[in-house]
Amino acid sequence: MVIRVYIASSSGSMAIKKKQQDVLGFLEANKIGFEEKDIAANEENRKWMRENVPENSRPATGYPLPPQIFNESQYRGDYDAFFEARENNAVYAFLGLTAPPGSKEAEAQAKQQA
C-alpha cells in the first residue's frame, strides 16, 4: 500500500504550501512511506486527483485543492481531515494503515478493544 499525497509545487498560496509541508513533514517524521504527486507539473496527476476526490468531498465551487491524500487509489481525505486525525492520534487509521506497536495510536486502539 502506497500513500499518495497530491501537492502543487508551484502554489502561490502560502496556506496551501504550509498545509502540504505539514502533511509531508509528519509522514517523513513518522517514517510512513509515501509518494508525492505534483499536480502543478504533471497534467495527468492533476486530472487523476480531480476525478478521484469523491463528490461529497469537493468544494461547492471550483476544484479540490492540495494536499489531497490517497492510499493507492482510495481517497483518504484533505488537509482538514488529516489534521483532525492527527489531533485525535488516529492518523494511521485515517491513512488505512496499521499503527506500529508502541505508538500512541496503537495503545489507544488496544484500550478500545479491551
UniProtKB/Swiss-Prot annotation:
CDD domains documented for this protein: GRX_SH3BGR (cd03030)
Motif SH3-binding mapped to chain: 61-67
Domain of life: Eukaryota
Subcellular location: Cytoplasm, Cytosol; Cell membrane
GO biological process per UniProt: positive regulation of cytoplasmic translational initiation; proteasome-mediated ubiquitin-dependent protein catabolic process
Major localization listed first in the record, in broad terms: cytoplasm
Alphabetical UniProt keywords: Cell membrane, Cytoplasm, Membrane, SH3-binding
Primary role: Appears to function as an adapter protein that bridges proteins together or proteins with mRNAs. May function as a ubiquitin ligase-substrate adapter. Additionally, associates with translating cytoplasmic ribosomes and may promote the expression of specific mRNAs.
Subunit structure and binding partners: Monomer. Interacts with PFN1/Profilin-1. Interacts with ERBB2. Interacts with ATG12. Interacts with BECN1. Interacts with translating ribosomes.
Protein name per the record: Adapter SH3BGRL
Biological source species: Bos taurus
